[in-house]
Each structure stands twice: as C-alpha cells, then as structure tokens.
Design a protein with these regions (language model features):
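Cell-envelope and extracellular/periplasmic
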Residues: 1-379
Length: 379
C-alpha cells in the first residue's frame, strides 16, 4: 500500500475535469482498467487544527464501471496515483493499494505532522497556531490560513489512518513554496521534517518517500521567481542526497514549458516506479537514478573532463529541439563568458576544449540553457 500526496500536479485527475485539468490519456486507459487486485481510496479534502480519527475514504476497485461515474471519487482520482498503482501491479503481479490524498495549491507545512517539527525544532518558532505543549488551540491567526496552516492536512487526512501499514508515499509538491522567498532555503529541511514525521507516526523507520522534481516552468519575466524555482529544485536534490529512504524522479524533460501542470503523468509514474522496483522489490538490474554531475577535472592539455554519477557506461544529450549539444561556457578572469568547444560525445566522460585563453582558473557552467537534458543510456 502506498500513499499519493501533494499539491496540484499530484491532484491532476485521471478522468474528471476539463481537458486542461485531467490526464491526456485517462479516458482511454480507464475504459480498459480491469485490474482485480488493485484498490484505491480517494481522501476527501478536509483539514483540522488537531489530529482526528475520522477517515472519509473507502477502498474501490480498478475497473471501468468505477471510473465511468461522473463526479465519483474514482473519476477524480489522481492520474499519477492511477498510473503508479497500475504499473506496480503489472510489474509485480501482487495486490496493490493506493491512497490519494492530494490537494492543489497547498504547502509542505500543512502535510507535516507535529512529530516532524519535534524532530526539527529550528523550523517551528513563531509559525504554528498551537500551544507550547502542542495542545489544540484557536490562537489568533489559526483559522485565517485555512488549509495552509502547518499540520492541518496531516491531522485530517493522514492521522486517521496512521499507523496503517504502508510501504511509503509518492509525493509531488513544492511549486507553492516558490511563492515564499523565506521558505525556499529551508525546503530540504522541511522535506526532512515531513519524512521524519511520517516515519514516526506510521511507525515505519524504513518509510519510503519517492518524490517528483517540481515541474519545469517558464516564469515569464519574473527572474526572482525563476531563481526561487531552481533553488527549490536544488533543495529537492539536497534532500534526496541526504536521505537514503528517499528518491527523486527527475522530470525536466517531461513538461509543458508554459503550463505548470503537464498533463501526461505516465512517464512521471514510471520514473517513480523504477525507484520502487530497484529499492523495494529486488529488481537489482533496474536503473532508477538520473545522471548527476559529480566533478570536473582540468587536464594537462587545457581540456576539462566531466564525470557524472549513475552513468557508468556513459551519457548523452537530447534536447527539446532534437539537437544533441549541451551548453558549455567558460568564464575568464575578467568575467567574460566564452562558448566551449565540445569533444568526445557519448563517452563515459565528456571533454570540451579549454584552449580559448581563459586560463586554468576559469569558471564553467554546464547545461545552463533551457531544454538541455542529460540522459544515461537507459534514461
């Protein structure tokens, strides 16, 4: 059993809603969804300033009749949750359960239990509408924030089923936090608080959290917001590096540049699936991690050698415009950037020419242009 939680990209529905707010293939695939050993539950949107015991969801079957009912919980099921459960079942041939607890526009704090903040007290001061002993209170401001108040969605949607036995959660959230400049530098710490809190309340020290890199999005002329967007992505990477029971599905190539809600969730679900198959279900040959830049080494001839983790057999570039060039530039001592000449395409290491007179102490940037993607041979 897995939870599916997060904001609007997790909530994007498999069938219900307008064409813009549902998955592009959902109507077709749900009409063929006859999976007798898969069950799902769709949580109702509700919040509470104190933990509750009332659960507003029940198990339903993965079958066409369920999804065909207009405005039913099935028709509003998260597309990502649908695909993740379906792909797990097809890969494992065992019973699978998925609980959808998504809510668009919500921040990470609302999903975090108080136990998470007990373990990360640096995040708590002056933030939460409760007393020092965490007794429920209606202090000034406690209601005005609605579902954005810290802990309130956890209290109403997850607390009623903890410590229900679950393997872990898939998580797609972070876009909301880019709106708050003061929260961006601590987003990795907030993910730790969320994960540590869930591990404790579900009494599962190996609770897995497989999450999606926030969608690539064109922020118009708002350069500050674009910077915050990329900073949250870096915070997500930081958390994934620090937490062995977490993994990030990179999706920079799976997006609609001017729509923060990409409609095709199948590719995203399959990348989350690879993490679970590799780390939880014994598929040792599966490649689940994307290439990560590790180091650059200046060679005696002036070239610079690049090395990437998770790409032992090499890596390649494939861009939105179908080109296979990655943007490299070198900065000289005067701060002037120079295009770099690429060599040795598709080798385990990537080398480009550093003979343009920039000097041995040059700075470098890699893949800075939008739409440039690095892949390992298997993805």
């Amino acid at each position: 059993v897995w939870f599916a939680a997060g904001q609007s990209n997790m909530e994007l529905q498999i069938v219900a809603g307008s064409p813009r707010s549902r998955d592009g293939n959902g109507l077709l695939l749900t009409s063929m969804a006859r999976l007798p050993y898969v069950r799902f539950a769709k949580n109702r949107k509700t919040w509470s300033v104190a933990p509750t015991n009332a659960a507003y969801a029940g198990w339903q079957r993965f079958e066409p009749a369920s999804f065909a009912i207009v405005k039913s919980p099935a028709s509003a099921l998260s597309a990502l949750a649908f695909y993740y459960a379906r792909e797990l079942y097809l890969a494992l041939d065992i019973p699978i359960g998925i609980v959808d607890s998504s809510w668009g526009g919500t921040n990470i704090d609302a999903w975090t239990p108080r136990e998470g903040y007990d373990l990360h007290p640096e995040l708590a001061p002056g933030k939460y509408p409760v007393t020092a002993n965490w007794n429920p209170s209606l202090a000034k401001g406690a209601i005005s924030g609605g579902c954005q108040q810290p802990t309130v969605i956890y209290n109403a949607q997850l607390a009623p089923v903890a410590p229900f036995a679950v393997r872990g959660a898939i998580w797609y959230q972070g876009e909301h936090n880019t709106n708050h400049e003061d929260e961006v530098p601590t987003y990795a710490a907030r993910m730790h608080a969320l994960h540590d809190g869930w591990k404790k309340t579900f009494e599962n020290p190996d609770f897995k959290l497989y999450f999606v890199q926030i969608a690539q999005y064109w922020c118009g002329d708002d350069e500050k917001r674009l910077d915050r967007w990329f900073d949250v992505q870096r915070q997500q990477e930081k958390f994934a590096e620090e937490e062995p029971n977490a993994g990030m599905a990179v999706t920079s190539d799976v997006r609609s540049w001017k729509d923060v809600h990409p409609r095709s969730k199948l590719a995203v679900a399959r990348r989350l699936l690879l993490l679970a198959l590799k780390r939880d279900y014994g598929f040792s040959d599966v490649v689940c991690d994307s290439p990560v830049f590790e180091k650059a080494t200046r060679l005696d001839n002036g070239d610079v050698k690049l090395e990437f983790r998770h790409a032992p057999k090499g890596w390649y570039v494939y861009n939105d415009d179908f080109s296979q060039e990655l943007s490299f530039e070198l900065r000289d001592a005067d701060g002037v950037w120079h295009p770099a000449q690429v060599r040795n395409l598709h080798k385990p290491t990537y080398v480009w020419d550093g003979a343009s007179g920039v000097g041995r102490d040059a700075h470098l940037v890699i893949g800075w242009a939008p739409g440039a993607h690095v892949f390992a041979p298997k993805g």
